[in-house]
């Protein structure tokens, strides 16, 4: 199978400051990839290099087997087949929604029957058929997002590129537009690259996630693999919350840390020192011990919240704050037992 997108050893600097450092990844046909990372990690620059708005210093980019950038090739933007929705606004404010989508076909008119059929199909696909005669200033932010996607899909691009497409929308509208946009992409069989800083969004909608830090890709994997079998401590901390401790491995598949001796998931040899990570959802709190891994603790404070209870407690010399969706009614100062569900993750050589 020919990759929808292939990036090989791509690098880019601005004024001798590296922004992209040896980036390599690929995207299968119909696959949705989310690139996530903190602000300034290089994810938007990577997207701009893919779109042809920035020229990389080295490396190569190919689209469905066709090289669009390499040492000897640099196709102009007009000769590539990317779709890049200008999210949040229509590109031609004096044209109707229908004409804006026709603009994506190159002439802004929809002259032929085939073009008109394509425009109608994109209006229906993105749920805006009833808006065809309106102008951009008559649309809400969410409606403009749909127009932008319909216009980008109209010329049937091989790949859609989206840079923080939902950031300007309120939470409720963002959720609806996001689900509709993902559904439209999948219904149209399009590969897509999303740039986002929203880890929950990526975990829910991506086929694969690439985590970036300081111009490098730390790991590219499915959401499940990235969350459950992370290859890098920085990646796992960005993709989800975690409680970390310095630790040392034992020969029996456990590690010693400030919470005591805990089971771990690691293939490193005994004596290896590193960092132990426990996901918050692995903890549950009970008044009594049980035949599982138990950590004795003292409840310092409980604070009921809307969807969970915030509990501060002391285990030995360590103070933990946990947000538990369901927790027994416990008075401050009472002794309780933390249960650990499953092994902790261990990262050799990562010391705090």
UniProtKB/Swiss-Prot annotation:
The keyword DNA-binding does not apply. Its EC number is 7.2.2.7. SUPFAM superfamilies: P-loop containing nucleoside triphosphate hydrolases. InterPro entries: AAA+_ATPase, ABC_SmlMolc_Importer, ABC_transporter-like_ATP-bd, ABC_transporter-like_CS, ABC_transpr_FbpC, FbpC_C, FbpC_RD, P-loop_NTPase. It is a peripheral membrane protein. Residues 5-239 form the ABC transporter domain. GO terms for molecular function: ABC-type ferric iron transporter activity; ATP binding; ATP hydrolysis activity. Keywords: ATP-binding, Cell inner membrane, Cell membrane, Ion transport, Iron, Iron transport, Membrane, Nucleotide-binding, Translocase, Transport. It catalyses: Fe(3+)(out) + ATP + H2O = Fe(3+)(in) + ADP + phosphate + H(+). It is found in: Cell inner membrane. It comes from the Bacteria. ATP binds at residues 37-44. The keyword Ion transport applies. Part of the ABC transporter complex FbpABC involved in Fe(3+) ions import. Responsible for energy coupling to the transport system. Belongs to the ABC transporter superfamily. Fe(3+) ion importer (TC 3.A.1.10) family. The complex is composed of two ATP-binding proteins (FbpC), two transmembrane proteins (FbpB) and a solute-binding protein (FbpA). This is Fe(3+) ions import ATP-binding protein FbpC. The lineage of its organism: Bacteria, Pseudomonadati, Pseudomonadota, Betaproteobacteria, Neisseriales. The gene is fbpC.
């Amino acid at each position: 199978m020919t990759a929808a997108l292939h990036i090989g050893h791509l690098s880019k600097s601005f004024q001798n400051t590296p922004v992209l450092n040896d980036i390599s990844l690929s995207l299968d046909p119909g696959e949705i990839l989310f690139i996530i990372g903190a602000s300034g990690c290089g994810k938007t620059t990577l997207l701009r290099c893919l779109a042809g708005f920035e020229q990389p210093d080295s490396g190569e980019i190919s689209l469905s087997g066709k090289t669009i950038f390499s040492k000897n090739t640099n196709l102009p933007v007009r000769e590539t087949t990317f779709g890049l929705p200008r999210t949040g606004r229509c590109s031609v404010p004096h044209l109707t929604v229908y004409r804006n989508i026709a603009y994506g076909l190159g002439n802004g008119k929809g002259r032929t029957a085939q073009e008109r059929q394509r425009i109608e199909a994109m209006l229906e696909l993105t749920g805006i058929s009833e808006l065809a005669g309106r102008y951009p200033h008559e649309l809400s932010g969410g409606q403009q997002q749909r127009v932008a996607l319909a216009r980008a899909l109209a010329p049937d691009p091989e790949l859609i590129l989206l840079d923080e497409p939902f950031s300007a929308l309120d939470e409720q509208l963002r959720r609806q537009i996001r689900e509709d946009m993902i559904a439209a992409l999948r219904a149209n069989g399009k590969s897509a690259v999303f740039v986002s800083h929203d880890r929950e969004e990526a975990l829910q909608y991506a086929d694969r996630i690439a985590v970036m830090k300081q111009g490098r890709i730390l790991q590219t994997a499915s959401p499940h693999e990235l969350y459950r079998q992370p290859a890098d401590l920085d990646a796992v901390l960005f993709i989800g919350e975690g409680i970390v401790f310095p630790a040392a491995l034992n020969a029996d598949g456990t590690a010693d840390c400030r919470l005591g001796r805990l089971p771990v998931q690691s293939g490193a040899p005994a004596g290896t020192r590193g960092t132990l990570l426990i996901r918050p959802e692995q903890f549950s709190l009970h008044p009594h011990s049980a035949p599982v891994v138990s950590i004795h603790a003292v409840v310092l404070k409980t604070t009921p919240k809307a969807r969970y209870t915030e509990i501060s407690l002391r285990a030995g010399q360590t103070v933990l704050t946990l947000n538990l969706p369901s927790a027994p009614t416990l008075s401050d100062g009472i002794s309780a037992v933390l249960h650990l569900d499953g092994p902790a993750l261990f990262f050799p050589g990562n010391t705090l």
